[in-house]
Amino acid sequence: MNLIQELEKEQFDKLSAGKVIPEFGPGDTVIVNVKVVEGERSRVQAYEGVCIGRSGGGINESFTVRKISYGEGVERVFPLLSPMIDSIKVVRRGKVRRAKLYYLRDLRGKSARIVEKKQDRPAKVVAGAAE
C-alpha cells in the first residue's frame, strides 16, 4: 500500500471505531439518527426515508436519503462516517434494479412506492430424498 492508502485506512479505522454501520443500499428505508446542536443544547433527531443512492468510497462515502415532509420532497446527503450521525437503522429492504433512484423525484403517491424484498427462505428438506 502506498502512503495515501495507509493514511486513509488509519482515518477509516479511527472514524468507524465503535460505530455499527449496517449494510444497506438504494431502495432501503432507513432511519438516520442525527445529532443536532441548538445553541448549547444537543439532541438526537430521527430522519426516516428511502436511500436513493450511495456514492464515493472509503472515508469519503456518502448516501442520500429522500422523504416526503408535508407534501414536499426533502433529500439529505449524509457522509457515512460523519460524527454527527448517531446511528443508522434499516427498517425495510427495497427491491430495486438501479444504483441511483433519482427517478423517484418525479413520482408521487403510489407510483413512488418501492416493492419490499422478500426474505430468502432456506430450502425445504424432504425426508428420505437425499438417500
UniProtKB/Swiss-Prot annotation:
Gene Ontology terms, MF aspect: structural constituent of ribosome
Gene3D superfamilies: 2.30.30.790
Pfam families (UniProt xref): Ribosomal_L19
Keywords carried by this UniProt record: Ribonucleoprotein, Ribosomal protein
One CC-aspect GO term: cytosolic large ribosomal subunit
InterPro entries hit by this protein: Ribosomal_bL19, Ribosomal_bL19_CS, Ribosomal_bL19_sf, Translation_prot_SH3-like_sf
Role this protein plays: This protein is located at the 30S-50S ribosomal subunit interface and may play a role in the structure and function of the aminoacyl-tRNA binding site.
Family affiliation: Belongs to the bacterial ribosomal protein bL19 family.
Protein name as annotated: Large ribosomal subunit protein bL19
Taxonomic source organism: Rhodopseudomonas palustris (strain BisB18)
Gene of this entry: rplS
